[in-house]
Amino acid sequence: MNNLAFLFPGQGSQFVGMGKSFWNDFVLAKRLFEEASDAISMDVKKLCFDGDMTELTRTMNAQPAILTVSVIAYQVYMQEIGIKPHFLAGHSLGEYSALVCAGVLSFQEAVKLIRQRGILMQNADPEQLGTMAAITQVYIQPLQDLCTEISTEDFPVGVACMNSDQQHVISGHRQAVEFVIKKAERMGANHTYLNVSAPFHSSMMRSASEQFQTALNQYSFRDAEWPIISNVTAIPYNNGHSVREHLQTHMTMPVRWAESMHYLLLHGVTEVIEMGPKNVLVGLLKKITNHIAAYPLGQTSDLHLLSDSAERNENIVNLRKKQLNKMMIQSIIARNYNKDAKTYSNLTTPLFPQIQLLKERVERKEVELSAEELEHSIHLCQLICEAKQLPTWEQLRILK
């Protein structure tokens, strides 16, 4: 049995035309576009299909638009396929989509709340002094150290999203962000400015966060039907009562996305489906782990693969075998740090023949390893890494 999680994208995934194929093919999509439009007194369908990209990117517009398309994708999936998830997770704004789909908030409540949130966030930086940038090819600790070194009360900057091992987002005052980028580039990092209208998940959102508390107090939050991973803690919400506090701090705290995906991995998730426009989270997941099969659902045509359970199962089997083969090879060829040759030999001599037999089975296309064989293979690799006394970071790289 495959364990399934649903992922929901955040701001930056918007594009003109998003959700149109769902609207063309499903009555429920037409209904939800109408409900969203009624809830916030604006034509959400027109904004998504015919709007100007600049207008769609404005925070107060992008947030309800993305949430609407994401919830439509979820409802289409449940209507057409209906396999329930074990976990839900949303990236930044996407956490609100997850809350709706798990029954914590109604769709209309979420659209209204997210519109208020977008207005507050946009108004928190009226002079547009802030910006956000994706930073790649650098690990989190050096980047955090740079932000701490450069950030001041008047020119703040900090890590806003921890997306993967070497892909993060910084947010804050434009001048401070530029300083961090210059120093990070000397360390070999690359950067890309994000197409957003405010410095989200930074201290520049503090006033918006405080005002948002008033809006949050107007809503009741029910317990979730399935566990939702919080961006703030990278573990599931305890209950509906904890949602309000998390959503207020959500504006100023970083999105712990890589940790959230590792949580899913550790709890046996084998497949994820990204519900919403584009496939940004599918791409991010591939940078975090090769143990989870990821699929987008942003348009009607994506349903074809999702409805083919045999092909999906084959994808998972092939993914596991490919990753296991890579893990075996890397554990065997990794440097031996153990200076006690006799102890090392005693530990590994019984292991290598077992690894070789399993490796031969993995490489045979017609063979499907049992769950016990998979677990045993990973355990053997772990024992070899420990016998070689590999540094923790290298063991994690091999075994992740």
Swiss-Prot record:
GO terms for molecular function: [acyl-carrier-protein] S-malonyltransferase activity. Transmembrane segments: none annotated. Its EC number is 2.3.1.39. InterPro entries: Ac_transferase_dom_sf, Acyl_transferase_dom, Acyl_Trfase/lysoPLipase, Mal-CoA-ACP_Trans/PKS_FabD, Malonyl_CoA-ACP_transAc_FabD, Malonyl_transacylase_ACP-bd. It comes from the Bacteria. It catalyses: holo-[ACP] + malonyl-CoA = malonyl-[ACP] + CoA. The active site is at 92, 201. Disulfide bonds: none annotated. Pfam families: Acyl_transf_1. NCBIfam families: fabD. Is involved in the mycosubtilin synthetase assembly, by catalyzing the transfer of malonyl groups to a specific acyl-carrier-protein domain on MycA. Belongs to the FabD family. This is Malonyl CoA-acyl carrier protein transacylase. The lineage of its organism: Bacteria, Bacillati, Bacillota, Bacilli, Bacillales.
